[in-house]
């Protein structure tokens, strides 16, 4: 298992960095939520933005360093480099082995939901027990907050650049469009995790909304409403679409750079969250064009290659730049050196029907856990990270049309996906609108397992987390379980072992346990958040 050097000198409070100097204490959580001292973390005020200088336009080919490039200033010729720095921060910045970039938050979100069973190992065991991001003092709470706002601030710098004359090049406009897209992506994440869903109360206060670069004189803001945040997201994406018109990514390794397909995909997600069904379906189907669905389990297994025909947006990894790949050590259930933390609920497997190519991914293994061999780290210990793919877009279109009441139209994109997975068309005969929506939502769970949609779908649909322990009859069965040496050993099955909130109460809709907290250090520094 590889060693990673964490760039803790960049771990700066979004409010505190405006005025605090010197050194401060920081801590992280272990698998059970206990604190592990990390010691004193040094940082310099003005280095918050300057670290971007280490990220060149071909940063995915050359590992960025922590060196400060004093020549990097917010001018049109540097817009692409500043965007690349924002992207690198979002996916490669880490504070612990269990907190490396945005992929760690995707893991967290699925571990908190229905269909993942935690094999009690290092990494996300506390997330499974709703015992980390709900606590303002937790290290992961701190990591999640600063990861987003540092990325937003970097994007704001790129967006703020003005260009005229010869400086107003297509490359400059594309970089600004990409920065707008990533800013919208970050605010969409914040809106879904720090407040209940828009359709519950669009006037609910959520998080601060910053659209200009900050500096030591910036006054910390209070919380904006969900409506204000979603308005900004849609405005950013529509502006980005214009700037990215005509932009073509040169190759698959450039899929980290947003194009209009990515913008349409984010618009589809946003419109689904805000109940704009026609717009959601239209944007989703537009985003999916040209991204062919997989029809073979061999192509499905691994989920580590950005050249996958379904992938619209992803984060590539190379041997020289691969910190984000460490997240595969939690998801990969086969790799001997992995933590193998993410196992499947046996009841989840029961929702699949015969002929589904995804059934081949299930394997009883280890001490009786059900493995889902969807994610595999490559032999060079790297793995590309999926952010958006066409299967999700078909599901968004299906759900949006079903919620509008157009059931006949809704099953068309649903069946496109089902057929690709080896299944016959969904039989609409005698089905109610609610039944069709439920089937589409269940298909989302089957298709997007492990891709970071678990708890946000729970929040969006205002339902409770559902975890059902194995019955005595189910637990008494024995299965041949694959072992790492290639042999098989009989074990009783393992299912959900944490089926209520930490206070002992039952899972309910719209619970505080589903939301991320704002770090206490942030609320202490910014009284406008209280």
Residue ranges and their predicted role:
Residues 55-106, 352, 426, 430, ...:
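Membrane-proximal, proline-rich intrinsically disordered regions
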Residues 67-72, 97-118, 195-203, 207, ...:
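Short, surface-exposed recognition loops and adjoining beta-strand edges that mediate ligand/DNA contacts
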Residues 83, 91-95, 228, 274-275, ...:
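Extended ligand-binding clefts on enzyme/binding-domain cores
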Residues 121-194, 224, 242-245, 380-385, ...:
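Conserved, well-structured interaction surfaces
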Residues 176, 183, 190, 267, ...:
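Structural register within alpha-helical repeat arrays
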């Amino acid at each position: 298992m590889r060693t990673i050097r964490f760039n803790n000198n960049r771990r700066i409070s979004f409010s505190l960095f405006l005025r605090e100097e010197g050194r401060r204490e920081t801590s992280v959580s272990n698998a059970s939520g206990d604190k592990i001292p990390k010691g004193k973390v040094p940082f310099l005020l003005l280095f918050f933005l300057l670290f971007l200088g280490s990220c060149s336009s071909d940063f995915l080919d050359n590992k960025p360093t922590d060196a400060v490039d004093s020549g990097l200033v917010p001018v049109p010729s540097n817009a692409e480099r500043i965007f690349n720095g924002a992207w690198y921060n979002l996916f490669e910045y880490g504070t612990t082995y269990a907190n490396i970039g945005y992929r760690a938050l995707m893991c967290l979100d699925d571990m908190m939901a229905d269909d993942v069973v935690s094999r009690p190992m290092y990494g996300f065991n506390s997330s499974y027990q709703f015992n980390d991001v709900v606590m303002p003092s937790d290290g992961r709470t701190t990591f999640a907050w600063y990861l987003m706002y540092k990325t937003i601030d970097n994007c704001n710098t790129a967006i703020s650049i003005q260009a005229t004359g010869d400086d107003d090049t297509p490359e400059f406009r594309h970089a600004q469009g990409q920065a707008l897209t990533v800013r919208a992506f970050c605010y969409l994440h914040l809106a879904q995790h720090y407040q209940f869903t828009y359709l519950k109360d669009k006037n609910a206060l959520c998080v601060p909304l910053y659209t200009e670069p900050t500096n030591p004189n910036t006054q910390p803001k209070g919380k904006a409403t969900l409506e204000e945040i979603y308005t900004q997201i849609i405005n950013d994406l529509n502006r980005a679409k214009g700037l990215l018109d005509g932009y073509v990514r040169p190759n698959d390794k450039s899929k980290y750079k947003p194009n209009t397909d990515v913008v349409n995909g984010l618009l589809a997600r946003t419109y689904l969250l805000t109940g704009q069904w026609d717009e959601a379906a239209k944007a989703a189907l537009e985003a999916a064009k040209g991204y062919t669905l997989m029809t073979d389990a061999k192509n499905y297994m691994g989920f580590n290659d950005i050249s996958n025909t379904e992938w619209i947006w992803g984060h590539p990894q190379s041997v020289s730049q691969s910190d984000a790949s460490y997240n595969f050590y939690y998801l990969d259930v086969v790799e001997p050196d992995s933590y193998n933390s993410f196992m499947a609920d046996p009841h989840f497997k029961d929702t699949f029907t015969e002929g589904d190519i995804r059934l081949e991914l299930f394997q009883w293994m280890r001490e009786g856990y059900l493995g889902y061999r969807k994610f595999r780290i490559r032999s060079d210990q790297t793995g590309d990270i999926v952010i958006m793919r066409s299967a999700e877009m078909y599901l968004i279109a299906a759900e949006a049309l079903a919620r509008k009441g157009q059931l006949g139209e809704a099953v068309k994109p649903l069946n496109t996906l089902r057929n690709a997975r080896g299944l016959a068309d969904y039989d609409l005969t005698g089905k109610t609108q609610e039944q069709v929506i439920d089937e589409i939502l269940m298909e989302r769970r089957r298709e997007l397992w492990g891709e970071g949609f678990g708890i946000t779908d729970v929040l969006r649909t205002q339902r409770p987390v559902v975890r059902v322990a194995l019955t005595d009859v189910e637990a008494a069965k024995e299965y041949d379980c694959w072992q790492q040496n290639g042999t098989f050993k009989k074990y009783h099955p393992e299912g959900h072992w944490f089926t209520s909130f930490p206070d002992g109460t039952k899972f309910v809709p719209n619970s505080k346990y589903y939301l991320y907290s704002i770090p206490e250090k942030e609320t202490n520094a910014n009284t406008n958040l209280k």
